[in-house]
């Protein structure tokens, strides 16, 4: 039986997937029920679905970090959220994740994009906080 979350080896380009600026994929402490989820809840983020991304997860002690992976079969499960005030919410989350507008590239994480595979077979391009 095929895993309903299978992530195919595919390069995402602007022509193959378009970023939905209101979607955010989370895989760690921003998930529902975990330590930093209150930031999403306070900003009115709406849970969309469980999803998977082609990445590898690393145990950083108190929290995980995910990096893009070109290895077939490497996937990280997380949650997809719709942000109702994306610009403001992402500014808050950038601070939470240690991303500084004054010193970009100096924190543990960077905001980027990722293709998310959903259980219904759909694929969405969303924001993610990648581990450097």
Regions found by a protein language model. Name each.
Residues 2-132:
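Glycine-aromatic micro-motifs
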């Amino acid at each position: 039986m095929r895993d309903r979350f299978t992530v195919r080896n595919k390069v995402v380009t602007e022509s193959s997937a378009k970023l939905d600026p209101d979607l955010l994929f989370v895989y760690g402490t921003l998930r529902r029920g975990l330590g930093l989820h209150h930031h999403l809840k306070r900003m009115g983020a709406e849970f969309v679905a469980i999803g998977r991304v082609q990445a590898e997860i690393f145990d950083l002690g108190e929290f995980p970090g995910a990096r893009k992976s070109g290895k077939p079969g490497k996937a990280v499960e997380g949650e997809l959220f719709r942000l109702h005030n994306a610009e403001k919410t992402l500014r808050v989350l950038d601070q939470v994740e240690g991303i500084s507008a004054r010193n970009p590239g100096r924190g543990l994480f960077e905001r980027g994009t990722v293709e998310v595979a959903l259980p219904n077979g759909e694929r969405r391009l969303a924001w993610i906080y990648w581990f450097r």
